[in-house]
């Protein structure tokens, strides 16, 4: 598919593939009221022939509203697309390592990524935006792995959990440096992500956005060297 507009007038699928099929979407607008694209074969989604927009129309509640859903032994490779107005932007229903996200623009979704129990997603470091993640596990047993260990730069991903624990606290998306994947864990403190500076504890441990700091922990901030001709004016908190 190299462009065009494709619309489902009912809650039926706009694009519905079968097992052992191969589908390449290189551009086009795809719109439906329920699940827009359901893949059971091998699918590549990119924008090599034009912009690719996957949009859920309306806000009906009688069935799930998803942008791209993967089932069975499907392999889904999302290199570039805009996914919007979905309850589940990318829904990995089956096959734990079946979805690879290289890049996408998420817009007005309730959950950008939705993972059924025991499912993961591969997110490459070419994805630099923020994505919200929700899992179907009930209850959630932590640590709950959410990304595979197949891609580099997992510690740099901007992932936010849309799940809460029994106390109403949103789970923290931590990083397993040994096994190279992101996982959900209870929130026990705060994170310090210093920009143009270094944040340390006890003068040795460097903090980043995947490291929690217990409440009350003294943190030392050290500004980076100012560019030539400029001076350090002060700190700004966000």
Predicted features and spans:
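Beta-strand-rich solenoid/repeat architectures in extracellular/passenger domains
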Residues: 1-13, 22, 26-36, 46-65, ...
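Hydrophobic beta-strand core residues of beta-sandwich domains
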Residues: 17, 39, 70, 92-95, ...
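Tight coil/turn sites that cap or link beta-strands
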Residues: 20, 40-42, 48, 73, ...
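Hydrophobic residues embedded in beta-strands of well-ordered beta-sheets
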Residues: 23, 43, 76, 179-182
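A short, solvent-exposed beta-strand micro-motif common in secreted/extracellular proteins
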Residues: 45, 78, 101, 217-226
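Surface-exposed interfaces of beta-sheet-rich extracellular modules
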Residues: 147-174, 218-238
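N-terminal capping/linker segments that flank leucine-rich repeat
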Residues: 168-187
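Secondary-structure capping and domain/repeat boundary segments
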Residues: 186-238
């Amino acid at each position: 598919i190299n462009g065009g507009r494709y619309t489902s007038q009912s809650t039926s699928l706009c694009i519905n593939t079968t097992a052992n099929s191969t589908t390449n979407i290189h551009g086009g607008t795809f719109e439906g009221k329920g699940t827009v694209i359901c893949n059971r074969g091998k699918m590549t989604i990119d924008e090599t022939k034009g912009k690719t927009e996957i949009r859920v129309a309306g806000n009906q509640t009688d069935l799930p509203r998803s942008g791209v859903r993967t089932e069975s032994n499907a392999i889904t490779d999302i290199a570039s697309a805009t996914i919007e107005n979905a309850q589940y932007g990318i829904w990995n229903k089956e096959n734990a390592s079946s979805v690879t996200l290289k890049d996408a623009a998420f817009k007005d979704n309730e959950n950008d990524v939705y993972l059924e129990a025991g499912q993961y997603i591969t997110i490459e470091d070419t994805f630099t935006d923020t994505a919200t993640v929700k899992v179907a596990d009930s209850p959630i047993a932590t640590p709950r792995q959410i990304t595979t260990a197949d891609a580099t730069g997992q510690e740099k991903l901007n992932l936010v959990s849309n799940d809460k624990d029994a106390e109403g606290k949103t789970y923290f998306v931590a990083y397993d440096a040994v096994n190279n994947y992101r996982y959900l864990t209870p929130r026990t403190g705060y994170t310090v992500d210093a920009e143009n500076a270094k944040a340390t504890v006890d003068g040795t441990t460097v903090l980043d956005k995947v490291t929690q700091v217990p409440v009350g922990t003294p943190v030392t901030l050290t500004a980076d060297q100012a560019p030539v001709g400029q001076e350090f004016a002060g700190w700004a908190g966000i």
